[in-house]
Amino acid sequence: MKKGLFILLALIVASSVFAFTKGTINPGGTVSFTSNKPNSDEKAITMFSITPQVGYFVMDNLSADVLINYTYEGQSESDYNDEYSLSNLGLGIGGRYFYPLAPGEIYGGLDFLYNSFSWEEEYEGGKYDGGRNAMYLGLKGGYLFPVVENVYVDFGLKYQMGLGDYGGDDYEDAPDEYKKNEESTFGINIGLQIFFSK
């Protein structure tokens, strides 16, 4: 047991030489694709999401981030539901703190995202489209596993919760109880991160 703890401690101390230094630039991001069937009789809902981000290390191991999120979701018509599509574009800022843990890095962070949604639904006899705006606070953590020098695979977890009220034309005349943004999302993602040091 003592040998195992000593080896783990030695790896943690040795890995501290791989800290990300002030001035490092970090482009990266994640891509995801999911297909979901709400029940066995419905057509699948297809969702594609891309989330690029750029970070700048304002001090050793502390990154300030700019985030972009684009998501598309769609479902084709079936006997039980109409055809619809939804797209979402989000812009945000955030930060992450990194800690060396051999052979890679663990991190934790926080971000603030402003999203703009638009949707279109086709049904017998017509078409409906609409949209809304919303704000979100996200907590995230993960592990960066090194692939080659300065390139890491990002295994992450994220929890996102809604802030404030929904905005947009569809919500101007809505009752107050329908305006509250009480959404919450938990996700697992994988991505690629690159680090360019000065």
Specify the residue positions occupied by each region the protein language model found.
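Cleavable N-terminal export/targeting peptides
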Residues: 1-23, 197-198
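Gram-negative (and chloroplast) outer-membrane scaffold detector with strong preference
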Residues: 22-26, 31-33, 48-139, 145-151, ...
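Hydrophobic transmembrane alpha-helices
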Residues: 38-43
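Internal, hydrophobic beta-strand segments that form the core of beta-sheet-rich folds
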Residues: 156-159
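Short, solvent-exposed beta-strand-terminating loops
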Residues: 162
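Solvent-exposed loop segments that connect transmembrane elements
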Residues: 169-176
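Individual transmembrane alpha-helices with interfacial aromatic-anchor signatures
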Residues: 176-185
